[in-house]
């Protein structure tokens, strides 16, 4: 009995849909997004069918309390809803994330089986965050072996040429060093 718990009612309904989908359309997946009344994991059952992908909102690059609750319930695939470049985090005219933040984030996603990403906020500061956007795209090629440092070198040498690349790396190093605390912990 779910009583007046609308989140639980929705989770039970979605679990039933997933079970029916699995029977009627084997191999198909159902993406569920914990949000508002369903932000907490269900209480009346302890697992979802293996055709469910949970699209999580509360994970950047560390195991938050909510993330840990979900990992106990769902060991399957995940989607992630990220807020890396949403304008309400800060001024849309200043950089918000750094290559190091992205490296940690992508490695976290790889470790926990994230298969899809929804970006809330597009990123609009190409001149100042160009290396960060580049690292975000390239890290997925080989998260286990690539590093933000080597990708920033690659970006600067490709975008500015080998002569100006060294100067631009110094510029970006100083810029990202000044916002690293915000990017990693105060977001």
Residue ranges and their predicted role:
Residues 2-187:
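Substrate-binding groove of N-acetylhexosamine-processing glycoside hydrolases
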């Amino acid at each position: 009995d779910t009583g007046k718990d609308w989140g639980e009612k929705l989770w039970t309904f979605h679990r039933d849909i997933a079970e029916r989908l699995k029977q009627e359309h084997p191999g198909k997946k159902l993406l569920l997004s914990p949000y508002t009344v369903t932000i907490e994991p269900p209480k009346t059952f302890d697992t979802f069918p293996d055709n469910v992908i949970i699209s999580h909102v509360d994970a950047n690059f560390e195991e938050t309390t909510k993330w840990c609750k979900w990992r106990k319930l769902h060991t399957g695939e995940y989607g992630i809803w990220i807020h890396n470049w949403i304008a309400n985090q800060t001024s849309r005219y200043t950089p918000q994330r750094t290559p190091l933040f992205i490296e940690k984030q992508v490695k976290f996603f790889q470790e926990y089986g994230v298969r899809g990403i929804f970006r809330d906020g597009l990123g609009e500061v190409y001149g100042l965050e160009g290396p960060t956007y580049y690292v975000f795209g390239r890290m997925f090629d080989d998260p286990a072996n690539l590093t933000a440092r080597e990708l920033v070198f690659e970006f600067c040498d490709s975008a500015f040429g080998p002569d100006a690349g060294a100067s631009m790396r110094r510029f970006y190093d100083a810029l990202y060093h000044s916002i690293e605390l915000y990017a990693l912990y105060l977001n």
